[in-house]
């Protein structure tokens, strides 16, 4: 807050910045709900620190029993109520996605999921393979909502190709939890194609970050993986 007052600009920490970007990219009601859930969880985690800071500014000697204590409880209850509402709405999203996954399992075509670090080129590859126009720009988190298309490979085999949310190092737990319904699309894939930006100086650390998130989601170690090195030119 002191920095914001001095610089007269909005100051964000890393998690807050990621949430801001996610919020600006969310194009569907599902995406917006997931961003809202993550944002509310983030706000709840910062309540105590915010009020302690205000008490110090006012010259208070302690937090317990101060005016902030009553207000923080009121704020917490309000946020928890909103979290419950959003979670309830997301439950229908989870059910719908689950039904769609079951329907795809009945189809004779294997499902291939594209995963990778944000801005690695997943959406560009997806567009080339499917002749689609999914937003593919040189920006972080251009894709928030998973997209699925049926394509025919050169050998004649048909597959369902899925484009997913890009990952980032130390992805906040609240984001993984909020976007679980979306990220779990990877769990039902027959093959996971890990698209890597081979020209990036942190290509190896990025690879580890992606694998860490997949492990957190519960992707089996026996899952069929293909590594695709992008931007080699």
Residue positions per predicted region:
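Conserved C-terminal guanine-recognition region of P-loop GTPase G domains, centered on the G4
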Residues: 1-10, 154-158, 179-233
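Conserved P-loop NTPase architecture
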Residues: 1-111
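Flexible beta-alpha connector loops of hexameric P-loop NTPases
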Residues: 25-29, 71, 133-135, 165-176, ...
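Switch I (effector-binding) loop of TRAFAC-class P-loop GTPase G-domains
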Residues: 95-97, 103-110, 128-160, 168-181, ...
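The Walker A (P-loop) glycine that initiates the GxxxxGKT/S ATP-binding motif of P-loop NTPases
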Residues: 116, 127
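Walker A (P-loop) phosphate-binding loop of P-loop NTPases
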Residues: 119
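Conserved lysine of the Walker
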Residues: 122
